[in-house]
């Protein structure tokens, strides 16, 4: 250990060792002390610690690294960190922490800082008094050479103090840290820091290097803090100057020591690098401080350079550069050293090859050279050569990727010397040296270590910096290649290519120089151009093409430069004399061809190019027979297609003639390559005139108008239009067919949505641009679009929304147009609607459009048009309406368009009410969508109109006040039509429209009776002479739910008219229509009429209906009366009289007339059913009604059921009214007596099941069929139980069998198209549901008979195949059926066809396994696909088997309580659901017979096992026969477990009763449950008939099985 001063360690702390660590008396006696990092220290006092902690601390003092690591790990994982808050522990840590923080082993260093993090978290502020003892090693740990240790040290310190508080820490403890690290750096060595008895010398050297490096980096860090702390706001008590003074004092001590400066050339790389960092930082912030020590540094520079290593070279060279930059006068100290000249030092440094990849060594070396200066660095030619030779030698020895850096440094070094040196001899020598390199490079004698492309990049880089070098390169190059003895073809092509590229690159550098005269430019640039032009005519095509491509680059370089006359003349001469022949020789794919355009572009602003260009063109057209000429001519348009030369060169007649002929020859075949045509269009007024482009456009248009175009036509069309853009309106007027182009591109549907659509968009944008400039042109284009689109809409050949969208696009794009420009004119609507109204007048349902009932009171208008024509007109109305609606939704509309739409809406709604495609055979799509969309649109318009208005104002403005606006105008127009004196069909339709729209308004309003009377009074409704107008207004206001005084007055007047003498049906109908309109739809307790007038009214009107209405088939007044009665019932329910009988007669009459397919009849039926339903609910309140209900119950149910079964035959079955009737029928038939159901035959039910698409009707039909089947099965069961001597012969009804046999088709196809085939699949599965219903609550023999029939007809196989497809059982992943019930189903719970079919399928599969288990199991066993059977078993075991097992066990438990088991007291049956086992015990005296039935988990796909447990009183043969008989019922007879138990019980009981068993099967009871009844006449043994039959069949004889005699029946 080195001797050191003691003044640094004077302070003592009670209970603590000194910060210097002067612990032992021995050390004091020797006048030596140890720092707290030394290996020599006094062990800390541990007496106050617990035993476990003492062990840990002592382990930390041991030499063994593993023991230290374990001790530190124990501290890190200490359970109670509060024990660290102990003075003796913290004292001990102050002793151990510095030594552990610099330990040789990195794991120890890492763990000590991890522990410091734990300690910081545990103690926080409590650690503050001890921080001055820990801070130095802690901060030194920041700069540990191991990154993980460094990060751990910083993280642990962050745990104690956040980073924003660190500056205050350095300020407070900086004066403590600096002396210690300085002292450690100067006085510690490997002997003091490492115990060499336990560590190697290398480990000790590494440790001391790491520690000293950390010391220097810590000082660097602290020095940087002095600059950062200048702006730090601190407590006044803390003196910044103290910290700074202490730091400078210790730095001075450090810098004064020779040991510090000796490290400049030290082999300790880490310390040297840290030293350079320290010096650089001090130099940056405080240059004067370094100034006083500069001599110490500079006198060691030569030694430093000679001792640089791979790690130290870059930082030390950077340091030297900075020092020279700051102290330039000091260079002479080492530059003039005769023993160590700089050139020698640096050449040795270069040849040492100490550079690392990407280290920046050569960059730093060049920077150092520039700092030193050329005159100091290379004072003589010899020194230049010495350094150049060193670079070349190193480049040849370096690796390839490093040699590029060496070459680059060499070239930049020469450039630096050439530029910086003032000695002309040295400059000339540099040029000579470079000329030698270039010449050898051209000759291929200069062997490169790196790739040639990398070397070329080096050359380009230095040429960019030094244009003299670029000139030198060209001088050498031209001299080399102009040597007549040199054959260029002998030079490697790659080398030639690179050299020419560098030559052209030098042109760019020459361009950037400011030359004074043209001669000076030509003297430099002329040889280069002449050389390249000469090479471009070389006989070798590769060389010629290479030269041409380089000339192209030259053209690009000078494209933005003003050329001098000699250069222009040189290019023009080359253009005319040499280039055409080169192009013809090399072809249009060569660079020479592109060079033609580039030279023309270069010269276009300097001279008239017409004559030179014509000269060139004539050389190309001199012979059309030569293939080379044709290829060049065909490629010329693509060269000039960019149009840059338009107006710069003139048309050449020979070229125009050629291209006219060529273009139209190509267009004759659409399959040709049309790129040349497109290029010709682009070269307009360069190669071809505008007239040629027009002819191309007109020819292409013909293909478009005939829809016979291909992509080539579109591309050419688009290009032509854009080329002729300036005169487009004039050209369109010249050829009117062009106006048809816009609709074609608007409405075409390109398959290629990208390519073709882009061209369409381009054409549209062009036309739009020109239309905005010319209003006349715009109007003509829009007129064409309007005519085209409206015609296509009417024909149904285009989607209405698409047409509307395109017209809206044109409307918004092509300037100002009237809003109705693209709508159908009023004349169209008048003609179409007028032709359809008479037809629809006979097709309406008055329950849907009540006001249209007035049409019956108007003289019938003859229908003089053909039905097909009516259909066509209606289709036109529909298409026009849908288009108009889409159009006005976007653009808005006026009152006329809305008026026309409303009439169309009425007609289309009637069409829908009749059912889609039930009126006209012409198909109409999206009618429902139109109705919904129009209602939504109309409601939206009403809401807009009503905004910020009260209800009274809204109705006044719509119906009374004369104001503008499309909604008021619309309502006034309908009001005027409906109140006109001359009543026509049109006015009645208008009245219905008024009603519909008033309903929309009324639903959005709230008004009281007073305000309603105000509106009705202003309308003069009570005195109006128009019943249509009165009815339409009152019907429209019904949603307001008010019964005002005026409404009551109108109602009473109508009743008065109907109470007197009634004459014509028309008058009665008018009064009834008004009465209905004046009757509120809400059924309230408030009487509609005074009770005194009700009876007279009912008697009078029912008498008229009975005597005149029904007999004369005047159904309208009867309908109106039944409609009124529905709302009148609460008022008259308590009245009695004969009129109730009449009303029930009308209802029955309506049911009887229901077979007539007429809209008025369907409305009559609906009103009758609705009234009957209301009467049926509360008939107990009125004895007359009750009597009518009871008396007519059976007949009424019969009529209702008959009407129900007729539904599928009605042509109006899809109408809204018919569907409403069906809903009432379903409700009224819920309690239909079984007697009525059984009175109908099966053939009357099944058509309804098969032809109905209504799920509710289908469900009711199934209910009736089950009712009928149940009754018949019960009768059959009773009959065969009485006639027990005969085996039952039961078969399914023929209609059911026919449907089961007539399978609808391929299951795979049907399931894949579920929506299409849903009905067929559903009917088929429902038929099977009915078949399985035969097995419910009947005898086993009857079941067996039906099963045999199914087997005989092979009906089960197609069913199972269908179920496999529906449930996806043939695939690895069957469908998930968890959401579907299995035991029962309700198809109305599901909205999708797929869900309905799957729900029904899983139920049928459940029924199959329940009733036909043996048959299903047999079918699956035939399938040899193991994967399939595994899927089926898995699916069944998860979804069906648990239900079947539970149901079977339930059946057994119920059977135990039945008479069959209770009658035998010795039988005991036990059920164990957990194990799925059934125990059968038969007690015989004190003994018992026991059998067990075990149900598998995949029941019934796996057989139930019947096992004999215990037997007594029977031999083995009989015992096995009973087991086999029970097993047979389960495995092959489709029997249930209950069936097997019953057979087993009877066999045993009859055996012990002495009944003789069959001599073949040894059982008393056969599987058919019959006794042995066939006795042999010889041996007298009895046999079962079935057993005997099987014996005869198998033995092919009729002999007795026992005695072998001929069998004679006894």
UniProtKB/Swiss-Prot annotation:
Pathway: Protein modification; protein ubiquitination. The keyword Cytoplasm applies. It is an enzyme of class 2 (transferase). Its EC number is 2.3.2.27. It catalyses: S-ubiquitinyl-[E2 ubiquitin-conjugating enzyme]-L-cysteine + [acceptor protein]-L-lysine = [E2 ubiquitin-conjugating enzyme]-L-cysteine + N(6)-ubiquitinyl-[acceptor protein]-L-lysine. Belongs to the LTN1 family. Residues 1-20 are annotated as: Disordered. It is found in: Nucleus; Cytoplasm, Cytosol. HEAT repeats lie at residues 110-148, 314-351, 372-408, 409-443, 590-626, 627-664, 736-773, 965-1003, 1119-1156, 1322-1354, 1355-1393, 1435-1473. This is E3 ubiquitin-protein ligase listerin. Component of the ribosome quality control complex (RQC), composed of the E3 ubiquitin ligase rkr1/ltn1, rqc1 and mtr1/rqc2, as well as cdc48 and its ubiquitin-binding cofactors. RQC forms a stable complex with 60S ribosomal subunits. One of its GO terms (biological process) is ribosome-associated ubiquitin-dependent protein catabolic process. It comes from the Eukaryota. One of its GO terms (cellular component) is RQC complex. Residues 1-10 have a biased composition (Basic and acidic residues). The lineage of its organism: Eukaryota, Fungi, Dikarya, Ascomycota, Taphrinomycotina. The keyword Protein transport does not apply. PANTHER family: E3 UBIQUITIN-PROTEIN LIGASE LISTERIN, ZINC FINGER PROTEIN 294. One of its GO terms (molecular function) is ribosomal large subunit binding. E3 ubiquitin-protein ligase component of the ribosome quality control complex (RQC), a ribosome-associated complex that mediates ubiquitination and extraction of incompletely synthesized nascent chains for proteasomal degradation. Mediates ubiquitination of proteins derived from mRNAs lacking stop codons (non-stop proteins) and other translation arrest products induced by poly-lysine sequences and tandem rare codons. Ubiquitination leads to cdc48 recruitment for extraction and degradation of the incomplete translation product. May indirectly play a role in chromatin function and transcription. A zinc finger (RING-type) spans 1558-1604. Keywords: Cytoplasm, Metal-binding, Nucleus, Repeat, Transferase, Ubl conjugation pathway, Zinc, Zinc-finger. CDD domains: RING-CH-C4HC3_LTN1.
